[in-house]
Structures are given as C-alpha cells and as structure tokens.
Amino acid sequence: MGSLSIWHWLIVLLIVALVFGTKKLRNIGSDLGGAVKGFKEGMKDGETPEGQQRDQLSRTNTVDVDAKEKAPHSGDSR
C-alpha cells in the first residue's frame, strides 16, 4: 500500500487523457514549456558579472551643477 507502481501511473495518465483530450494536454505542455523558457531567459538577463556592472556605472555622464535659489517670476504678485 506504500508507493504507486508504474501501472497505477499509466491508469491515471489514461484517465487524464480521456478527460482532457490529447490536444488540450499538448497545448498545456507547450504553454508550460514556453513559461519555463521565458523564466530561464529572465533569470539569465538579471545576472550580470560584477565587472560589467562597474564598467556601466563608471561610463555614465555626470553633470556637476550648483543649486541656487529660484528667482521669483515677474508675474508673481506674492
């Protein structure tokens, strides 16, 4: 009564195929495969070597400015 044998799994698979149909199961399989592929690509894009990150940060153009008080507009009546 412990684990299920191969015959139990084959019967379950046959019942699932009869209930859902092979076309529906094929669509579910392809959708699941596409989702896993997209997840793996997303994980690969998120991982960048640390050396590349430093290079990207050092290449940014920085503009040094000093903040001054804002001059009132001539139209302001405050």
Swiss-Prot record:
Self-association state and partner proteins as the record states: The Tat system comprises two distinct complexes: a TatABC complex, containing multiple copies of TatA, TatB and TatC subunits, and a separate TatA complex, containing only TatA subunits. Substrates initially bind to the TatABC complex, which probably triggers association of the separate TatA complex to form the active translocon.
Pfam families: TatA_B_E
Upper taxonomic lineage: Bacteria, Pseudomonadati, Pseudomonadota, Betaproteobacteria, Burkholderiales
Entry's localization field: Cell inner membrane
Cross-referenced PANTHER family: SEC-INDEPENDENT PROTEIN TRANSLOCASE PROTEIN TATA
GO cellular component: TAT protein transport complex
Keyword list, A-Z: Cell inner membrane, Cell membrane, Membrane, Protein transport, Translocation, Transmembrane, Transmembrane helix, Transport
Gene designation per UniProt: tatA
Keyword Cell cycle: no
GO molecular function: protein transmembrane transporter activity
Function (record text): Part of the twin-arginine translocation (Tat) system that transports large folded proteins containing a characteristic twin-arginine motif in their signal peptide across membranes. TatA could form the protein-conducting channel of the Tat system.
InterPro entries attached to this UniProt entry: TatA/B/E, TatA/E
Transmembrane segments: 1-21
Segments of this protein annotated with the region Disordered: 39-78
Main location: membrane
Family to which the UniProt record says this protein belongs: Belongs to the TatA/E family.
UniProt membrane topology term: Single-pass membrane protein
Biased composition (Basic and acidic residues): 39-57, 65-78
Cystine bridges: none
UniProt-listed GO biological process terms: protein transport by the Tat complex
Organism expressing this protein natively: Paraburkholderia phymatum (strain DSM 17167 / CIP 108236 / LMG 21445 / STM815) (Burkholderia phymatum)
The name this protein goes by in its record: Sec-independent protein translocase protein TatA
